[in-house]
């Protein structure tokens, strides 16, 4: 009986973690769509509207995705004149990183 209850607790914990991950992915997707999609391709299949804006699904070919965490939290500044500065808050940074990891081309 203890084994059954322990197993059920583990299943519920994994389900809750999966639900939180799904919420974070949706939040990251929404943030990037709102803040970045006027120039960048922020999804798995769209194209960038600005010719010099990289596709977000290919960022891992240029940088380790985790390396963007600090820049997103402290303020993202680009030398490109059309790119505005962005600074995201803690949970938003995590959601963006999770979403970016989920869409990378393999």
What are these regions (language model features)?
Residues 28, 46-48, 74-75:
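Short secondary-structure boundary/capping segments
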Residues 2-15:
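Bacterial N-terminal signal peptides
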Residues 28, 33-42, 96:
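The canonical Cys-X-X-Cys-His
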Residues 55-101:
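Extracytoplasmic electron-transfer domains, predominantly the class I c-type cytochrome c fold
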Residues 13-31:
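Electrostatic cytochrome c docking/interface patches
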Residues 105-106:
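Short, solvent-exposed mixed-charge patches
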Residues 42-45, 70-71:
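Short beta-strand/turn micro-motifs at beta-sheet edges
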Residues 17-22, 45-50, 54-59:
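His/Cys-centered metal/cofactor-coordination and adjacent catalytic loops
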């Amino acid at each position: 009986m203890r084994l059954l209850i322990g197993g059920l607790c583990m299943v519920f914990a994994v389900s809750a973690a999966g639900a939180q991950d799904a919420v974070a992915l949706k939040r990251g997707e929404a943030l990037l769509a709102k803040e970045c999609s006027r120039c960048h391709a922020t999804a798995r299949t769209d194209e960038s509207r600005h010719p010099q804006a990289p596709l977000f699904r290919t960022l891992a070919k240029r940088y380790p995705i985790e390396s963007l965490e600090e820049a997103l939290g402290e303020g993202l500044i680009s030398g490109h004149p059309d790119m505005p500065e962005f600074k995201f808050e803690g949970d938003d940074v995590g959601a963006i990183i999770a979403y970016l990891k989920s869409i990378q081309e393999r």
